[in-house]
């Protein structure tokens, strides 16, 4: 196969792979585990890594980083001209920085997502989920179709993250609208407009905390205190809040949606979970492995020529570790295409690996376990209202999920 033919054949961004990219990733692991693809719109070279060891190694390699300014200007220039989406406005945060700045910021923020804080939020998550399920039950009793995404997966993380940062609950509709705009209009005017409004909102809330430092004991108040003491800059503060709200929201929404979908697509595993509710934790982990909400890690840059297997990735080109592909590598996972909620061990990379392991993983897990487990318990006779093949998936391989998940719940 010629290089150009292979590029056409192995293009994970092609529309036909959106709903189910796994057959393509199986072929790539076997035939082109380190695959160079030139973006059709941007002309930039992306290197897709699909084998578990290569993905894991790339996420640990100090010669592969996230900060574009660590490259010479001539190598960085082709990438900068495409950084026009809303996320480009706010890159001074743990998601986009390398050590030592990454280490400093993560040390400030990580305690808010640690085991103690997450445990203290668990009862609140249960309360919110209970209220959302009550609303779903009322709609079902009236004969209406219910949508897991719209009525459970979307509102839950918005409410939880707003409470964590001390944002007014009544502003949740604004967060939702901004998030939808940023996802719908990537690299466009809508994305920039929504991102700017979100940034302005965060800046206003920071100013309010400075004016009334005694007002709250939430995460934003604690970070504002760090800004006052010089531990974090204003740009880093705004950027960190922006990314935590946006990334935490979308990842959790999609994890809940995909988790429910996979259980309904695998009735034997759903029955197993109903018989043994304590398997809800492993069920969430298996969702992260089998069909996780994050397709690939955030783009990395080769800071020097990087050898991966027999290939050499030139300095300045983009490295994309494909988490979905690594998580079905048969060299690591027996029967990788089987959805098994009792899988043990399960060393998936669904939340990443190394210094950029997902900061909010513990909180996302609590929300997913509570939402999915409570839904299964509350509505034992629920079923999909449409054929799974008719579900619409988001078009982005990075943050992926179904747009709607309609259920039938017998009255």
Whereabouts are the PLM-identified features?
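Cytochrome P450
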Residues: 1-411
């Amino acid at each position: 196969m010629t290089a150009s033919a292979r590029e056409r054949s192995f293009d994970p961004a092609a529309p036909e792979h959106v709903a189910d990219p796994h057959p393509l990733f199986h072929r790539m692991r076997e035939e082109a585990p380190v695959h160079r693809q030139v973006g059709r719109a941007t002309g930039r070279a992306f290197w897709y890594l699909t084998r578990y060891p290569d993905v894991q190694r790339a996420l640990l390699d100090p010669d592969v980083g996230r900060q574009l300014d660590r490259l010479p200007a001539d190598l960085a220039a082709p990438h900068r001209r495409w950084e026009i989406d809303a996320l480009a406005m706010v890159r001074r945060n743990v998601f986009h920085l390398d050590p030592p700045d990454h280490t400093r910021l993560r040390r400030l923020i990580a305690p808010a997502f640690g085991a103690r804080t997450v445990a203290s939020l668990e009862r609140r998550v249960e309360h919110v989920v209970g209220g959302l399920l009550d609303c779903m039950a009322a709609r079902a009793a009236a004969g209406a179709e219910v949508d897991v995404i719209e009525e459970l997966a979307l509102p839950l993380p918005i409410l939880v993250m707003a409470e964590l940062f001390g944002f007014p609950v009544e502003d949740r509709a604004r967060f939702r609208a901004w998030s939808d705009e940023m996802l719908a209009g990537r690299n466009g005017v809508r994305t920039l407009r929504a991102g700017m409004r979100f940034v302005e909102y965060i800046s206003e809330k920071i100013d309010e905390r400075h004016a009334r430092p005694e007002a709250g004991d939430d995460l934003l108040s604690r970070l504002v205190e760090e800004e006052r003491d010089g531990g974090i800059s204003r740009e880093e503060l705004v950027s960190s809040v922006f990314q935590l709200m946006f990334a935490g929201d979308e990842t959790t929404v999609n994890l809940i949606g995909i988790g429910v979908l996979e259980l309904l697509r695998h009735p034997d595993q759903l029955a197993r979970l109903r018989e043994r509710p304590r398997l809800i934790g492993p069920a969430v982990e298996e969702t992260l492995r089998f069909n996780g909400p994050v397709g690939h890690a955030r783009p990395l840059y080769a800071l020097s020529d990087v050898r991966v297997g027999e290939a050499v990735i030139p300095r300045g080109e983009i490295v994309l570790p494909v988490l979905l592909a690594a998580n079905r590598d048969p060299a690591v996972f027996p029967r990788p295409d089987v959805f098994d909620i009792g899988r043990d061990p399960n060393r998936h990379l669904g939340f990443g690996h190394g210094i950029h392991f997902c900061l909010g993983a513990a909180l996302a897990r609590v929300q997913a376990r509570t939402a999915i487990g409570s839904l299964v318990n509350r509505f034992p006779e629920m079923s999909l209202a449409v054929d799974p093949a008719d579900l619409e998936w988001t078009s982005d391989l990075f943050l992926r999920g179904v747009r709607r998940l309609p259920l039938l719940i017998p009255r």
